[in-house]
């Protein structure tokens, strides 16, 4: 399931993040890439152990915790601490698939995270740069994503994807992975659609007798499928 989620960050949070990231020291993004990805990757990345990276990561995690849509769609069990990258001057990242498992370096690499869901949080105004589209190959074909600053897109970690060359300006984003309670994307999509339908029915017809039954179906499916 490819899903844009708007306004994960507020304007105040965006301003705070931009101020901190503008003052950061960036490194060659290939340092953190796997062998195959390093051949396609050309960008700058904020070192994971830098104080600014940790502060910015905490801010993003706090924003995610307030997004009911993110929780409903991803059903997170673990979230890899958000990372930050920057593209400019024609930089790009060719087609690749994310590693199946990431090891959280902030915990000494001892805490593996299965990358069921990939996520990109856009931090630059789309009018401030040319190119930089996130191109994702999914079951419905090729999807090109370029969202307003503060908006998030999530998609299956199994997806082949790339970042197009940035030919003008600078594209800054946060990216991270989620280990979901449901590793199966089709099951996540089904429960998300059911949850959205229950919420709409609650708004349109409060007290409808089917709400209790539908909510029970949701939780019984989650109970059957969840890995917790």
From Swiss-Prot:
Its cofactor is Fe(2+); L-ascorbate. Its EC number is 1.14.11.-. The keyword Oxidoreductase applies. Transmembrane segments: none annotated. Pfam families: 2OG-FeII_Oxy_3, PKHD_C. The lineage of its organism: Bacteria, Pseudomonadati, Pseudomonadota, Gammaproteobacteria, Lysobacterales. InterPro entries: Oxoglu/Fe-dep_dioxygenase_dom, PKHD_C, PKHD_hydroxylase, Pro_4_hyd_alph, Pro_4_hyd_alph_FE2OG_OXY. 2-oxoglutarate binds at residue 171. SMART domains: P4Hc. It comes from Xanthomonas campestris pv. campestris (strain ATCC 33913 / DSM 3586 / NCPPB 528 / LMG 568 / P 25). GO terms for biological process: DNA damage response; intracellular iron ion homeostasis. GO terms for molecular function: 2-oxoglutarate-dependent dioxygenase activity; iron ion binding; L-ascorbic acid binding. It comes from the Bacteria. This is PKHD-type hydroxylase XCC2773. Binds 1 Fe(2+) ion per subunit. PROSITE patterns: FE2OG_OXY. Fe cation binds at residues 96, 98, 161. Keywords: Dioxygenase, Iron, Metal-binding, Oxidoreductase, Vitamin C. Residues 78-180 form the Fe2OG dioxygenase domain.
């Amino acid at each position: 399931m490819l899903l844009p989620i708007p306004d994960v960050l507020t304007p105040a949070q965006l301003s705070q993040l931009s101020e901190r990231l503008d003052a950061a020291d960036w490194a060659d993004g290939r340092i953190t890439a796997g062998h195959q990805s390093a051949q396609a990757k050309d960008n700058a990345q904020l070192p994971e152990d830098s104080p600014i990276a940790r502060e910015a990561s905490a801010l993003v995690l706090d924003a995610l915790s307030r997004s009911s849509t993110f929780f409903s769609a991803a059903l997170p069990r673990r979230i890899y601490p958000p990372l930050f990258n920057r593209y400019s001057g024609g930089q790009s990242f060719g087609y690749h698939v994310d590693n199946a498992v990431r090891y959280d370096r902030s915990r000494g690499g001892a805490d593996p995270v299965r990358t069921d869901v990939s996520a990109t949080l856009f931090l630059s105004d789309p009018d401030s740069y040319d190119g930089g589209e996130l191109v994702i190959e999914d079951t419905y074909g090729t999807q090109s994503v370029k969202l307003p600053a503060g908006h998030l897109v999530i998609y299956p970690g199994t997806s082949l994807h790339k970042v197009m060359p940035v030919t003008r300006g600078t594209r800054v984003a946060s990216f991270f992975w989620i280990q979901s309670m449901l590793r199966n994307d089709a099951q996540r999509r089904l429960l998300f659609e059911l949850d959205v339908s229950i919420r709409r029915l609650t708004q349109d017809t409060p007290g409808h007798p089917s709400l209790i039954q539908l909510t029970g179906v949701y939780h019984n499916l989650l109970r059957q499928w969840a890995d917790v």
